[in-house]
Structures are given as C-alpha cells and as structure tokens.
A protein has these predicted regions:
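Thiol/selenol-based redox catalytic cores and closely related redox-interacting motifs
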Residues: 34-118
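Local sequence-structure signature of Cys/Sec-based thiol-disulfide redox active-site neighborhoods
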Residues: 1-23, 27-32
Length: 118
C-alpha cells in the first residue's frame, strides 16, 4: 500500500492524488500538517528513496522563505533539520509518495506511473 502525504489545498497534491486514482493505485492519504512526519520517518524515507535531505524542503514555500532556510539550514546539523521539518509540515516538499520500496518527493507524472507499475 502506498501513502500519499499531502496538503489537501495544494493543487499539485490534488493532481498527484487524481493520477494515483486514475492509475488504480491502492493508497491512503495523510495530511502533512495534521499528521506531520516524524524525524525518524523522514530519516528512513531519505534512506529508502535515495534522497538528500535538501530534497525534502519545500523551497518555494512561504515558511521556508520567512525562516530564511536557504541560509539557515547550512548552519544546522542533520538532526536539527529533521527535528525542524518534523515540527513544521509546511516546510516539507509535497506531495510525498511513500511505499515499501521507495519514496518520491514532489510530483512528476512519469515517476508516479513508474512507481505504481513497479
């Protein structure tokens, strides 16, 4: 089973959900604000998805800019960054698609199609 971690008001997240439905994928949704991922979940997803920590940041988000995260994160340890992300779901890139064998950060139609077919 896949989990789509999303912000329901986000148009890109809505597109991702619609694509999963069109593909007939078995998935559940999780609101990134009300059920923010834990630091340990984020650490595991980085490993599982072959991601870099920086790829989990919502760099176009208002909060990222308000907190000057482009510069600030460079002064923070990985643990500090994961803790901050786990307390502020709006800092996390969305949607996140999580399944047993992988993780996708952001929405790319072809990547979603490949993940569902795998």
């Amino acid at each position: 089973m896949m989990t789509l971690i999303w912000y329901p008001k986000c148009s890109t997240c809505q597109k991702a959900k619609k694509k999963l439905e069109e593909l007939g994928a078995s998935f559940e949704t999780r609101d990134i604000v009300t059920q923010t991922p834990t630091a340990e979940e984020l650490r595991e997803w980085i490993r599982r998805g072959g991601l870099e920590l920086r790829q989990l940041y919502n760099v176009s988000g208002r909060l990222y800019k308000e907190l000057n995260m482009k510069e600030r994160r460079l002064q923070m340890s990985e643990d500090e960054q994961l803790d901050l992300l786990s307390r502020n779901g709006m800092l996390i890139k969305r949607p996140l698609l999580v399944w047993e064998d992988g993780v996708l950060a952001g929405y790319r139609e072809a990547a979603y199609e490949a993940a569902v077919k795998a």
